[in-house]
Amino acid sequence: MVKIIGISGGSGSGKTTIVNKISEVISEFVLISQDNYYKSVGDYEYEFLDVNFDHPDAFDNNLFYKQLKKLKENQSINMPLYDFINHKRRDETIKIVPTPIIIVEGIMIFVEERVRNLIDLKIYIDTPNDIRFIRRLERDMSKRGRTLESVIEQYLRTTRAGYYRFIEPTKEYADLIIPEGGHNDKALYVLSSFLKTLVKDSSKFF
């Protein structure tokens, strides 16, 4: 039976760090990023758009749920790919064949109850605001074609408020909260030990 591990936290919280840690324990898994399920917003320059990317409605939540459910049922999907430079969904998709363990990561994967119910292990990465902002700034400028001014404007306009309104409250649904941006050795040890046992016999937990 397919098991889903969900990793959430604010933008720049260190979700990739945890995915890399999991990869040291689990050799075969599929990674699903909620970012690929953003809705297309057209071909205009980002600075001229009044779009809130830090709101649950920015995602195609129905498609995200349906595809995650299919993977849970051991069915393949054609996952969308999102172009962050042009802010629209690409024409091509990528075929995802389910593995026994699937990792799904994203800032709002714990917001909807129907999605939470599909996730067997929920991990929340708790990271100080300044660290998250610096990480997001570096990522968006180096990988997403953003300017310093646009990242700061978005953070002040929607990102900060969206985190406190939608993301941080979902900590209550987490099975494990990892502090310090994913660099807490004791928490990572607990996670690694759990995953090793999970790989051997998932029936002990689910």
Swiss-Prot record:
Protein name: Uridine kinase
GO BP terms: CTP salvage; UMP salvage
Domain of life, source organism: Bacteria
Catalytic activity of the protein: uridine + ATP = UMP + ADP + H(+); cytidine + ATP = CMP + ADP + H(+)
Alphabetic keyword roster: ATP-binding, Cytoplasm, Kinase, Nucleotide-binding, Transferase
Family label: Belongs to the uridine kinase family.
GO MF annotations, alphabetized: ATP binding; cytidine kinase activity; uridine kinase activity
Cell compartments where the protein resides: Cytoplasm
CDD domains from the UniProt entry: UMPK (cd02023)
Chloroplast listed as a keyword: no
Binding sites annotated in the UniProt record for ATP: G9, G10, S11, G12, S13, G14, K15, T16
Organism whose genome encodes this protein: Borrelia duttonii (strain Ly)
Annotated EC: 2.7.1.48
Record GO cellular component, one term: cytoplasm
Cystine pairs: none
PANTHER family per UniProt: URIDINE KINASE
